[in-house]
Amino acid sequence: MALKMAVVVDYQNVHLTAADLYMPGCPPEEALIDPYRFASQLAQARNATNDDAHQVEVSRVEVFRGLPIPEDDSDAYRRNQAQKAQWTRGHHGVVNVTLRPLKYSWEYIDGVRRPVRSSRQEKGVDVLCALMLVDLARCGLYDVVVLASRDTDLAPALDNAARTGRAKVEAAKWYHPGVPSTRGRIKTERRLWTTSMTEQHFLSSLDPLDYA
């Protein structure tokens, strides 16, 4: 019987890292990743390096992503909402997508308060990922909990989850044989298993839909 695997996805980190690595020079939206496809490819990559007793199946995918506000970019806001709806369709109870509004500086133009697009940035997504990682590791519903992110600020969350949780805590990363920086891992108190995902896994994770 396969082990139950839950995956916490730091979406922009996973998406943009893959875009830079495998599709340099292309618009990031061409490298859009479908979370369930990604988790399935992660399971496939992990299973290829484990024996029959340690095979996993995707049981839950928690996705956290920044969301442009409509006052700044109504088209991007609409696309993000459409993507969330598409990614969760058919995966009720398995895939959850949490969109957190981006943070902005504001300015007044002709007396109207407007967001400064160049100032927008994700805030709090890493905290949400950390909290979910620990919760999933502790809840007792999953055998394996994987963090998909290269954000080193999440190392303490991995340590906490591994130390206090009931599940086996792991990480996932993109790997390219020609890029030395992809050979490393997030440094934690004790070495955690990290599944390396390749360009083929990336291509099989892509969302084929056009949200324009």
What are the residue ranges of the model-derived segments?
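Domain-level signal for Mg2+-assisted phosphodiester chemistry and nucleotide/NA-binding surfaces
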Residues: 1-118, 168
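Nuclease catalytic cores that cleave nucleic-acid phosphodiester bonds
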Residues: 96-212
